[in-house]
Amino acid sequence: MSDLRELYQTTILDHNRKPRNFCKPAGANREANGWNPLCGDKVTVYLTVDGDGVVEEVGFQGSGCAISTASASLMTQAVKGKTVDEILEIFDRFHQLVAGSDAGEADSGKLGKLSVFSGVHEYPMRVKCATLPWHTLRSAVRGEGEIAKTE
């Protein structure tokens, strides 16, 4: 088994079994819901954004497959302490990575632990699982009231 595939499996299993930030932060002032109608994954992302646009706290709740849960867990770790603009940039990089674009491959080093999702593009149905929490995060960051969907 390749090192990246082994890291992928280890990381996904760890974050699925023990998701980080699986909660609603007490002071959350933004939230959004996401739903994948094809597989039934559901997620709610909660943010506490300060007056300067920095995410002080982030959490999520919901139910979904291992990839969706692990993606949400790793996402919360990646965006805490970041500005809204930085989060939108990370969103774009992550989306390019899991969609298999050349730009995403080039940026994988900038994504840290999130780069374990680089092989997801080989499984198109799983791309939606990995990106659902991210689309939901983007809706929360932007303050959109719609349910984020992968379709």
Listing of model-derived features with the role each one plays in the protein:
Residues 62-69:
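Short, thiol/selenol-centered motifs that function as redox-active sites or metal-ligating centers
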Residues 69-70, 89:
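Alpha-helical macromolecular-interaction surfaces
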